[in-house]
Amino acid sequence: MNQITPTYRWARRAQDTVAPAVTATAHGNAIQLGGGYGFPDTLPDIVAEAVAAAEAKAETLQYGPLYGLDDLRDTIVAYLAQDGIVAARENILVVNGAKHGLDLACRVFLEPGDAVIVAAPTYLTAVHILKDAEASFLSIPQDEEGMDTALLRRRLEERRDNGGPMPKLLFDVPDFHNPTGITMSAARRRDLVALAEEFDFVIVEDDPYRRIRFEGEP
């Protein structure tokens, strides 16, 4: 039997040592600060949910709609409206978490070698996904207001003036940033939107923590 040598992309994934380390500390009495683990008492009653699901097995044990359950998509539309985002059910695609969503965004918007704007530092798992997409990085430092948008503008202008490759995508966690904990100011958010319109790149926002706060408005 011939020995099969893994492709270089698979070989790079196989060297990932982050998942075992996180998994090893995700249980027991340890408080895991390296991932978005919820407080156990706030988790849903999975036994009650399982009983309800069994009673509705004709619906729950079949394939669901391709873009997600209609009721869920409508709920997401209403949730977005709280932040002034106008959307319709047809604009919503339900995915299996942020990692799945970011991977899909990379497949849609990026070609190997394309530049992606990220904060320095940025979410470690996002780095792995972007590397798998063979993206290059334009890393922008942060201060207490989040990503330095003035510096980002200068970097973008330099690339444009020198005929360099322009970024196609920006990834950030603007609320309680992982790993810094910084929340981006409203002024910086407006700056980012203006830059995206001027320099024609897509903003991918990872926003799991926006409404989990002890003080202030989201």
Name each region found by the language model:
Residues E59-F199, R210-P218:
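Conserved core of the PLP fold type I
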Residues N2-R12:
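Conserved PLP-binding active-site segment in aminotransferase class I/II-type PLP enzymes
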Residues W10-G97, L104:
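N-terminal small-domain helix-loop-helix segment of the aminotransferase-like
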Residues D206:
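Glycine-centered flexible beta-alpha turn that most often forms the glycine-rich phosphate-binding loop
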Residues T5, A19, L43, G164-M166:
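Intrinsic-disorder/low-complexity coil detector
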